[in-house]
């Protein structure tokens, strides 16, 4: 039996040979109409999706053409940069400039990259979230935020000025979650057609959750209030919370975001006593902000433990922040412990 030749996917009972769900591009065109700012936003999202399809293809090939996890440098925060980090950055910057963005802020560059002088939007992006998972089969993602480019420093605006935000999750399928301020939409990439098709609209988080996502290995470094939150949850139905909790931790914010948006849950990565973690670890502008925008659009919340993420005015491009997001009720409960 030969394994060479054209790839033909398994067809399951009940599968259709046609995908009739609306394409994301068509949705964006209808949403944008003739409005200039909306058209610029739609073009930027389309550019990101074009880049995501190319990135997905490279991820799928693993180490066959070369080692994507090869270390090639460090960024401004001394985080190690892999070959695929730099390649992803270059890809998205090139496509976003071609799409007319005024400027692009990437995790992999110290300063924003200038684009079209009269562009209407500014795009903040983490080209490849979770690159430590490269080669392990664990989740990877791209996450982005779009702001109006109507100030001298568009990336130092509070998150509540975002026009749109979204992420692409590279897992056993390539999935998109995004919002243009009219609810959260899910879509999946169809490799047969090269198109993202909408699979769910008006995604809504549940009212209650018993799923927690956090790095349990750092519990001893958390504040007394946060340690009490974890301990009370782990006591389950015999403790003050009165019900059992499950733990989920994927090691990539986009992966945890995608799971929580589908199943509910609460994620936290807050400040702790370790050197370098005093203000949290995730980036406010291009990680916490888009997550907070999507959480709000799905009926959830996102805070730094006490303040709404969307109300925080960044002071620097790569500012770090504590982040708590997910089901609104649980975010509020954690906030009570956080304040202790």
Swiss-Prot record:
Show the GO cellular component annotation of the record. cytosol
Note describing how the cofactor binds? Binds 2 magnesium ions per subunit.
Q: Where in the cell is it found?
A: Cytoplasm
Q: What is its EC number?
A: 3.1.3.11
Co-factor requirement? Mg(2+)
Catalysed reaction, written as an equation: beta-D-fructose 1,6-bisphosphate + H2O = beta-D-fructose 6-phosphate + phosphate
Q: Which pathway does it serve?
A: Carbohydrate biosynthesis; gluconeogenesis
For the ligand (Mg(2+) 1), the binding residues are 107, 126, 128
List the InterPro entries hit by this protein, alphabetically: FBPase_C_dom, FBPase_class-1, FBPase_N, FBPtase, Fructose_bisphosphatase_AS
The region annotated as signal peptide is: none
Q: Which Gene Ontology biological process is one annotated for this entry?
A: sucrose biosynthetic process
Q: Which UniProt keywords apply?
A: Carbohydrate metabolism, Cytoplasm, Hydrolase, Magnesium, Metal-binding
| 4Fe-4S found in the keyword field | no
Name of the molecule in the record: Fructose-1,6-bisphosphatase class 1
Q: What organism is the protein native to?
A: Brucella anthropi (strain ATCC 49188 / DSM 6882 / CCUG 24695 / JCM 21032 / LMG 3331 / NBRC 15819 / NCTC 12168 / Alc 37) (Ochrobactrum anthropi)
Gene field: fbp
